[in-house]
C-alpha cells in the first residue's frame, strides 16, 4: 500500500465511484515530445477557414512544439513557466482558487515562494499578450513561434502532474509516474489518441479562462495516480507491457479528453488574440455553448467527493442515455439518467 500523506488520506477515506454511460443512438460511438507535437498540430482541427495563416502554421507548430522545453537547458527563467504546484497554496486547498494577480500573490506569499511553485498560468497569459502584439505588427513568423510556445504551456496545464506538488508521485510512493504517464504511456499508445476539433469561442476574460482550466484539470491528478497504482498492482511492476496496457485501459478516456481540450483551447486563445489585434469576429461567438462533435464522458469533479460530485457528458446525436454509477467492486449504486437526450452537453449531480 502506498504511504499516505494528508492528501492521500482524503483519497483513502473517500469512497470511489465510477460513472458508466451507455448510449443507444443512430451511430455507435504533460505529454513529452510526442504529446506536445500531437496537441500543437491538432490545433488546426478547430481553425476557421478565414484564418488562412493557420493552414501554413500547422507543421511549424508541431515542429516547434518542444522549443520551450529545449530552452530550459540554457535559460534559468524557463523552468518555472512549465508548472504550478497549486496545491502548495493554502487558499487553494481551502477554496479551490488562488489570486490570479501575480503581484498580489507575491504580496501575500513572497516572491521566492511564488516562483518556487511555478508560474505556468502567467506564462500562458504573457505569451498570449505577445502573440497579440505580433499580430498587430503583422509579424506572422514571430506570432507562429509564440503560438508554438503557447501551445506547449497550455498543454502542460492539461498534464495533471504539471499542476501538483506530487508531480512525480513522490508523496504517494509512486516515484517516476511523471515520465511513465506523459512519455512512456503516450509513446506506446499515441496511435489511439484520436479526436476532433470544435466550434471556437472568443475569450472575454483570458485570466479567468486560464485559471479555470487549471482548476478543472487539477481534478485529474488523483485519476492519474489511481491508474498508475492499479496498473502496478495488476502487473506487479511498472515497466512491462502488462502494466502500460492496464494503465492505458484506465487512463485512456480522460487522457484523450485532456489532449482534445488542450488543442481546442490553444486555438481559442490564438483566435482571441488575433481578433483583439484587429481580426474579424465572423463565425466566432463569445462563450458559445457549442454542440459536441463526438461522445465524451468526463471525469467527475470533485473526485474524491464529499458529499456530492458533478458528472459531465456530451452526446453528438439524439440518443437514449443510461448513466449509472458503480462502486469499485462493480456494485450498482445509482441510476442518474435514463431517458432520451438531444445532442448537446449535460451535467448531473450525484
Each language-model region and where it sits:
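C-terminal outer-membrane/trafficking sorting elements
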Residues: 288-350
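Short, compositionally biased serine/threonine- and acidic-rich segments at solvent-exposed termini, linkers
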Residues: 281-288
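Catalytic Zn2+-binding segment of zinc metalloproteases
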Residues: 155-169
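N-terminal, motif-rich segments that launch catalysis or mediate targeting to/interaction with membranes
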Residues: 29-149, 165-275
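N-terminal secretory signal peptides that target proteins for export/translocation
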Residues: 1-12
Amino acid at each position: 500500500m502506498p504511504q499516505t500523506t494528508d492528501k492521500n488520506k482524503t483519497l483513502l477515506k473517500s469512497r470511489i465511484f465510477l460513472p458508466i454511460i451507455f448510449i443507444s443512438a443512430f451511430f455507435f460511438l504533460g505529454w513529452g515530445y510526442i504529446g506536445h507535437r500531437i496537441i500543437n498540430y491538432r490545433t488546426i482541427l478547430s481553425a476557421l477557414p478565414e484564418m488562412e495563416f493557420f493552414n501554413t502554421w500547422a507543421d511549424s507548430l508541431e515542429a516547434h512544439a518542444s522549443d520551450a522545453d529545449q530552452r530550459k537547458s540554457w535559460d534559468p527563467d524557463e523552468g518555472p513557466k512549465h508548472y504550478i504546484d497549486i496545491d502548495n497554496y493554502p487558499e487553494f486547498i481551502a477554496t479551490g482558487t488562488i489570486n490570479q494577480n501575480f503581484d498580489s500573490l507575491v504580496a501575500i506569499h513572497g516572491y521566492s515562494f511564488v516562483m518556487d511553485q511555478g508560474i505556468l498560468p502567467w506564462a500562458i497569459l504573457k505569451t498570449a499578450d505577445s502573440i497579440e502584439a505580433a499580430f498587430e505588427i503583422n509579424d506572422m513568423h514571430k506570432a507562429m513561434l509564440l503560438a508554438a510556445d503557447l501551445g506547449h504551456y497550455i498543454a502542460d496545464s492539461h498534464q495533471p502532474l504539471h499542476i501538483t506538488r506530487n508531480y512525480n508521485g513522490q508523496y504517494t510512493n509512486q516515484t517516476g509516474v511523471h515520465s511513465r504517464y506523459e512519455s512512456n504511456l503516450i509513446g506506446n499508445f499515441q496511435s489511439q489518441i484520436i479526436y476532433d476539433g470544435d466550434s471556437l469561442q472568443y475569450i472575454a476574460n483570458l485570466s479567468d479562462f486560464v485559471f479555470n482550466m487549471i482548476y478543472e484539470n487539477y481534478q485529474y491528478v488523483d485519476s492519474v495516480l489511481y491508474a498508475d497504482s492499479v496498473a502496478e498492482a495488476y502487473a506487479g511492476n511498472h515497466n512491462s507491457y502488462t502494466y502500460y496496457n492496464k494503465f492505458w485501459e484506465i487512463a485512456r478516456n480522460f487522457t484523450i479528453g485532456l489532449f482534445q481540450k488542450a488543442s481546442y483551447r490553444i486555438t481559442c486563445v490564438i483566435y482571441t488574440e488575433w481578433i483583439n489585434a484587429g481580426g474579424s469576429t465572423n463565425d466566432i461567438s463569445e462563450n458559445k455553448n457549442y454542440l459536441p462533435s463526438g461522445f465524451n464522458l468526463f471525469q467527475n469533479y470533485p473526485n474524491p467527493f464529499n458529499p456530492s460530485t458533478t458528472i459531465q457528458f456530451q452526446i453528438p446525436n439524439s440518443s437514449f442515455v443510461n448513466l449509472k454509477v458503480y462502486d469499485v467492486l462493480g456494485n450498482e449504486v445509482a441510476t442518474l439518467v435514463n431517458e432520451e437526450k438531444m445532442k448537446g452537453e449535460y451535467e448531473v449531480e450525484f
